[in-house]
Amino acid sequence: MLLSSAFVGSCLAILNFAAAVSAQGGLSRTTLNIVNKVISPDGYSRDSVLANGIHPGPLISGNKGDTFQINVNNQLHDNSMNTSTTVHWHGIDQHHTNWADGPAFVTQCPIVPEHSFLYNFTVPDQAGTFWYHSHESVQYCDGLRGPLVVYDPEDPHKDLYDVDDDTTIISLSDWYHSPAHELLPGPIPPNSTLINSLGRPDGSDLPVTIIEVDPTKRYRFRLISMACHPYFDFSIDGHNMTIIEADGSNTEPLSDIDQIRIYPAQRYSFVLEPNQTPGDYWIRAAPLQLGNTSNPDTTTSLGLAILRYTNRSGYAQAASVDPYDISQTPIPVNPLLEQNLHAYGDVPELDEECDDCKLTFDFAFNFTAVDFTVNGTSYVNPTVPVLLQILNGTYTAQELLPHHSVYTLPRNKTIEITMPGAVTGGPHPMHLHGHSFYVIQSMGSDTTNTVNPVLRDTVAVGGATGDNVVIRFRTDNPGPWIMHCHIDFHLALGFAVVLAEAPQDVAEYVSPIPTWDELCPIWDNAPSHN
């Protein structure tokens, strides 16, 4: 493939920029070749969409302050799934680099087959557990997802653990035996749950992931839900966990937790001390389906792995417990409650004189149209990305497309969003791009916390009538940021809005690279769109 002069010039500019910032931070370079490949993580062979031919995709890592340069090469050819692609770096704020955020038709046009795009962004003040995934239709459900970790050499919790590396990342994924678009409007229960790269469908005895621990060390595990649909009850038989991070933000250590309910796109770091009798212990991820908050699936799609002590004398401990026997499944005594997590730092106060700073998003499902709505409107991708519309001089919510799905926000204000419960198909994990937010009121809680609530980027909404979720954040990051349900099938059915933050300031704050300008003309001239 011939490289355009703009592409070459862009690469040289980026390399010069990277050299200029190297004194302040490092440079993390990665190439992701997006390919089709037949894999069988649960014993069933199917074609998939993968980064570098593996699932999950390769770990991308760096340190706080680093610049990340990630070249995405689209080598897809299987028309039974999406062949265009984008990649979103989930949880990264993207200050000054809204163009690199990734959601198709919000911040960019998709990358078509046989073309590449170089994402370039700096992470100056974030550290923690993130991930990356396709943000084109339901493509990430077909396998395009992987871990992204930003380490902090000055981590305030570093005295609590001894090991934190690629062996302590635990990913949870739902896996389907059919291409994701065939499951729409869906979703349907997954055929299996994968812990890292392996799963067992229908209660089989196929191999599972084994995670080894040395009883003389303490481990920081980074738990990532890469799911498209279910949420999970995660636990490790016989072991408690100390939570120290949620969605890339440190929390006050919360100890003695024996179960974590984790929703799609959420992440937690927990410290585990292997202080039990040496042996093997089941790691469990029991999926819960939509509308079912009390009965996890402990049989057909139960996710399993093994925590193995390196000084064990045998394998009897795990083998003697039937993981599918409910009578042998440990009952949680102290499960994690979101409202018990507390962040560091000050919660921003409301701007009482700001009429545009308090929003309510009413979610609903239209059974006739078979779509989701936010305040009565179902989101449909515009033909021109919202960022490009803004850079071309369109600033008002009345003018920006898609109509009635774009909300403009003033700059440097505190925004409070209320999301009532009782939503069909919930709970719904709502993710806001470009920001972390304080969860003033959590799902299922009748109390508010404006002192030290958890700071995160994905929060569950659902519950009963009258059950509100309230979040709060500062508008310090001009650009269009999509807010959507992270059940990917629901996003495909219109469960989203765009928050256009200080649109009149975007041109000064965001400067896309030349190859970004080429994406839409290439997309428009592609012979077909899939």
Swiss-Prot record:
E.C. number: 1.10.3.2
Name the record gives this protein: Laccase-2
Gene: LCC2
Regulation: Inhibited by chloride ions. Inhibited by citrate. Inhibited by oxalate. Activated by acetate.
Activity-pH behavior: Optimum pH is 2.5 or below with 2,2'-azino-bis(3-ethylbenzthiazoline-6-sulfonic acid) (ABTS) or 2,6-dimethoxy-phenol as substrate, and 3.5 with guaiacol as substrate.
Role: In vitro, has activity towards 2,2'-azino-bis(3-ethylbenzthiazoline-6-sulfonic acid) (ABTS), 2,6-dimethoxy-phenol, and guaiacol. Although brown rot fungi preferentially degrade hemicellulose and cellulose, the enzyme may contribute to generating small amounts of lignin breakdown products required for catalytic reactions.
CC cofactor: Cu cation
Cofactor note: Binds 4 Cu cations per monomer.
Statement: the UniProt record of this protein carries the keyword Transcription regulation: no
Localization: Secreted
Induction or repression: Expressed during growth on spruce wood (at protein level).
Organism in which the protein naturally occurs: Fomitopsis schrenkii (Brown rot fungus)
Keywords recorded for this protein, A-Z: Copper, Disulfide bond, Glycoprotein, Metal-binding, Oxidoreductase, Repeat, Secreted, Signal
InterPro entries in the record: Cu-oxidase-like_N, Cu-oxidase_2nd, Cu-oxidase_C, Cu-oxidase_fam, Cu_oxidase_CS, Cupredoxin
UniProt main location, coarse: secreted
Disulfide bridge partners, by residue number: 109-520, 141-228
Protein family: Belongs to the multicopper oxidase family.
Coiled-coil regions, chain positions: none
Binding site for Cu cation 2: 90, 133, 486
Residues annotated as signal peptide: 1-23
Enzyme class at the top of the EC tree: oxidoreductase
Residues bearing glycans: 82, 120, 191, 240, 292, 311, 366, 375, 392, 412
Start and end residues of each Plastocyanin-like domain: 36-154, 167-311, 379-504
Recorded superkingdom: Eukaryota
Residue sites binding Cu cation 4 per the record: 428, 485, 490
KW Glycoprotein (keyword) present: yes
GO cellular component: extracellular region
